[in-house]
């Protein structure tokens, strides 16, 4: 359950702007603010079942976007490769100038993504 929450939060960060304002707000209330279905229902004026349905449909929409676009997966891959590059750099016998330039480049790549 915890992993699913993290994944949905991650997808919400990437694709949240694609969702309607209402769907995004409900997901943020549920996952980020840790509100119950009843609390969300009271706040936005629909039934608990309506909130649950909206959350499920929004989750499906986020998962579909990731399946088709793969932006989160690509982002994670780039982050991992940048980390591996820096780790390999620390273990190598490269001059300080080269090491600093590569670190600067890796940091700029991270900042860009």
Region locations from a protein language model:
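Helix-turn-helix DNA-binding elements, focusing on the entry/boundary residues of the two helices
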Residues: 37
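Amphipathic alpha-helices that form helix-helix packing interfaces
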Residues: 78-88, 92, 98, 102-112
């Amino acid at each position: 359950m915890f992993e699913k929450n993290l994944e949905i939060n991650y997808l919400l960060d990437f694709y949240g702007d694609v969702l309607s304002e209402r769907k995004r707000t409900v997901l943020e209330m549920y996952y980020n603010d840790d509100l119950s279905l009843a609390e969300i229902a009271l706040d936005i004026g629909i039934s608990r079942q309506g909130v649950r349905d909206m959350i499920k449909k929004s989750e499906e929409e986020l998962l579909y976007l990731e399946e088709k676009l793969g932006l989160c997966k690509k982002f994670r891959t780039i982050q991992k490769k940048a980390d591996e590059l820096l780790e390999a750099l620390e273990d190598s016998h490269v001059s300080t100038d080269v090491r600093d330039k590569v670190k600067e480049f890796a940091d700029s790549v991270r900042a860009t993504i």
